[in-house]
Amino acid sequence: MQQSTIGAVYSNFLGQAPDWYKKSIIAFLIFNPILFMADPYIAGWALVLEFIFTLAMALKCYPLQPGGLLLIEALFIGMTSPEHMKHEIVVNIEVVLLLVFMVAGIYFMKDMLLFMFTKLLLKLKNKIALSMSFVAASAFLSAFLDALTVVAVIIAVGMGFYSIYHKVASGKEFHSDHDHTSDDHVDHPKRQDLEDFRAFLRNLMMHAAVGTALGGVMTMVGEPQNLIIADKASWNFGEFFVRMSPVTIPVFFAGIATTFALEKFKIFSYGAQLPQVVRDILTAHSHQQEATRTKQDSAKLWIQGFIGIWLVIGLAGHFAAVGLIGLSIIVLATSMNGIIDEHSIGKAFEEALPFTALLCVFFGVVAVIIDQGLFTPVIDWVLTFEGRSQLVMFYLANGALSMVSDNVFVGSVYITEVAAALEHGHITRDEFDMLAVAINTGTNLPSVATPNGQAAFLFLLTSAIAPLLRLSYGTMVYMALPYTIVLTIVGLAATYFGLGDLTNWLYDMHLIEHHSATLGAEAAAH
């Protein structure tokens, strides 16, 4: 029977997504304008929850299309304006530049990264030690680099491991071309090894992702909102680290202890071992690479290593915006390694650009949150508290809202409100500094609960490796749960019991100094 035009359009709509999913998105699109006319505040929250739903269903359909449709409608009916959406993108231009250039830059360093991490994986046969080293390494790197950059590195490494084994399991040689997205050529006896390897890589990906949160909270370059908070408070790199340390140091060790416990007791889907057959294949690949490595190949690895050193120095020294350093890496890596045709360069951008577009849609949703005042009641309520209870409430409120929204937005909204309170004389400068610590730790730590809380987690969820490892939204939430509980509680306890006393001790030791009452023109105007 010939399909009608409407039927054909419906079939094309969102492609291979399940029928119930298509109908849900259509229902949202019909329902939202009606709800907006009745109650804009509730309609705003409905849009936020619908957007989270599209993220949760990322393995069914990439969130850019359904999320983008919902946002376009929101713009048309007046929930926010294109001008405000553009403003949010401009405010976060460093994150956009980072995604466009830094992730592509990492692509051109993947040979060196795979070489290093293969050595680590094959040398460290103890899974607990390997997991703890992944958490510690990603935490250390995230303290100096951006968390998104570190996750891009981990994804590149994971993809490398996965494609090597998948190629051999499908009956191909190491040097053969292969589509690692299809399991059709994997023999049934090897399927279980493949599933075990997926579980093993899922473990490492989640440990590394949490590591970025543990390290990212410590320094002003670790997360984008840290830069905003440091700018408002006029803190430099060293002062930011010292002021955060009463909370971040106990949390870091609690995070490492959690990794040990999860791997030791094999709970929350952790404890998956690297199958021996996979280890043998990775070892054979490593030996083959070493046997066939030419002087030219060795030179490429050395050059990528030197570029990696420039990456760390450039970011730690704040020589330029993260994205611009990423652009320098693209130029250096491609020119020194002889990659000069447009097609080869274009491949590097395939991974990050869909996510960049999705993040811009997300900034549109943030504009709706601001214009409809969705978080205002929570902010006003938290500002009614005083003393230690206010610190705790700021920490919890930031954490709760960061699980729903983006922690960059939540952190910047709260620090702006607190800066305004200081300008109007409602709080002292010392209280402002303490609240800034509570805001920073609150946005960074509990937000590991959901992929929409941390941009690095969202990047992992929507990356090419997530469907290969069967890493869904629900899986990420479940595997992050023990970390969420431990990091939130330890951070909360450190904020309530230790932050005030330890900050006073830091003043007494002259490791930090009291600031003047005013924030300066930039903070006040912001």
From Swiss-Prot:
It is a multi-pass membrane protein. InterPro entries: Na+/H+_antiporter_NhaB. One of its GO terms (cellular component) is plasma membrane. Coiled coil: none annotated. Keywords: Antiport, Cell inner membrane, Cell membrane, Ion transport, Membrane, Sodium, Sodium transport, Transmembrane, Transmembrane helix, Transport. It comes from the Bacteria. GO terms for molecular function: sodium:proton antiporter activity. It is found in: Cell inner membrane. Its main location: membrane. It catalyses: 2 Na(+)(in) + 3 H(+)(out) = 2 Na(+)(out) + 3 H(+)(in). The chain crosses the membrane at residues 25-45, 52-72, 89-109, 139-159, 204-224, 240-260, 305-325, 355-375, 391-411, 448-468, 479-499. HAMAP family: NhaB. Na(+)/H(+) antiporter that extrudes sodium in exchange for external protons. Belongs to the NhaB Na(+)/H(+) (TC 2.A.34) antiporter family. This is Na(+)/H(+) antiporter NhaB. It comes from Pseudoalteromonas atlantica (strain T6c / ATCC BAA-1087). The lineage of its organism: Bacteria, Pseudomonadati, Pseudomonadota, Gammaproteobacteria, Alteromonadales.
